[in-house]
């Protein structure tokens, strides 16, 4: 999988091959790639990361490959929470028995929860 990734929190704005982060394209999703990039660059304690696409943000708490195509240009953004607010570190889950391609749906067809 090849993705265009940019993030203001660390200096990265380039094409990234998932294989360079030891991710297997057939079982890992876009959120796994973003999580690996973020952790490689120091991780985060009280931020919740989101994917930004076409003016909409999607929390990185699920299988983000449902919202993105493999050649999409995405941006990682953050939402800061107060220090006293209990926020669990986001956890990315992969679907082991399906390919990314089989999980893709059109962006407009996805209903996002508030």
From Swiss-Prot:
One of its GO terms (cellular component) is nuclear envelope. It comes from the Eukaryota. This is Uncharacterized protein C18G6.13. It comes from Schizosaccharomyces pombe (strain 972 / ATCC 24843) (Fission yeast).
């Amino acid at each position: 999988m090849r993705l265009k990734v940019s993030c203001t929190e660390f200096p990265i704005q380039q094409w990234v091959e998932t294989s360079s982060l030891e991710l297997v394209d057939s079982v890992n999703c876009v959120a796994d790639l973003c999580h690996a990039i973020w952790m490689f660059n120091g991780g985060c304690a009280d931020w919740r990361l989101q994917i930004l696409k076409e003016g909409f943000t999607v929390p990185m708490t699920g299988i983000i490959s449902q919202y993105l195509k493999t050649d999409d240009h995405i941006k990682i953004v953050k939402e800061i929470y107060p220090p006293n607010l209990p926020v669990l570190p986001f956890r990315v889950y992969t679907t082991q028995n399906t390919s990314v391609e089989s999980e893709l749906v059109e962006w407009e067809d996805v209903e996002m929860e508030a």
